[in-house]
Amino acid sequence: MSKGIVVIITGTLSLLFSSLMEGYSQDGSGHSARIMFYNVENLFDIFDDTTTDDDEFLPDGIRRWNYTRYSRKINSLYKTILAAGEWSPPAIVAFCEIENRKVLEDLVHGTNLSKYNYSIIHQDSPDPRGIDVCMIYRKNMIDIISFRYLLPPVTGDNPDATRSVLYSRCLFSGDTIHLFVNHWPSRRGGALAGECIRMQIAGMIRVKIDSITSVMNSKARIIIMGDFNATPEDQEIKLITEDYDSGMSMINLSESLAGGTGTYRYRGTWEIIDQVIVSDGLLNCRSGVYSHPGMLRIFKPDFLLKKDPLYPGLSPFSTWTGYRYQGGFSDHLPVILELLVR
């Protein structure tokens, strides 16, 4: 083969690769957008909030939480978000275990994320510890039509024993995305712990989806993401994915993730409790914004993992092991969903 032909082929492949990368990059051209969810494991500031139980995250508290540790945590999260975007940070980053708006402002405005024009959606939840669900979004890529925080009609002795669900209508490339961000009650004390409230939240979301589809039939683009403290096999998740009267289907994309993987590791076993559920309207649309199961992944670069000291294999490099500080990122791994446009 002559040198001239090699040059032509190499140049053609280079142009093809560049065009493909452009189509999947977040350069503001509207070709794609990444949505990330991340349980950030207790992102507290170092100041006392007299309205919540945050005493352990004070400089004189049991965790000795101080400015140095807080700054390291902020910079670790910035590093993770930037790496998750590859070409540029995700269009939307949804969080849970955030104490207040101030820590989000420190993350968005106090790091190099300030270059990416992020805006904040946050509201204090009724959680006794004061940890909230919230999100940041890039204003040059996403418009927020509206948002509200939803609470189920919780029954029982403790009506404040849950977090709000953040529901927002987001406009991307001319299409409306209905986005729900969740952090359901923990299974601490066993899998059945908190199940009643988790079922109530699932029922509330199902009612909201019925309301959306009553207006848009089965064409609505819906994304439900978060830390559900339940696996794809649990009944509270199945309640969301059961058949709807409108004929629309909700598909749990997390079920398609490879076996042996997960977002959280408990006693040496990976679990997928941070999940993404989407409507078939997002998967099957013939034009506009869409996604498909292969576009969901668990973000697990080497720096987010460490050797598990008790069990074979790797675990998330967490900030804490019990009450012992180890300076890592989070005890959960983030999940990322890619949205494309056709």
Predicted regions and their residues:
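N-terminal, active-site-proximal structural segment of metallo-dependent hydrolase catalytic domains
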Residues: 23-117, 121-133, 304-313, 317, ...
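Second-shell loop/turn segments in exported
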Residues: 61-68, 89-95, 122-123, 154-155, ...
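Catalytic metal-binding/acid-base residues of hydrolase active sites
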Residues: 41, 98-99, 185, 228-231, ...
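Active-site His/acidic residue clusters
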Residues: 51-54, 175, 180-194
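Structured beta-strand-rich core segments of catalytic domains in phosphoester-bond hydrolases
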Residues: 98-185
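Bacterial Sec-dependent N-terminal signal peptides
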Residues: 1-30
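Metal-dependent phosphoester-hydrolase catalytic domains
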Residues: 26-27, 209-222, 230-342
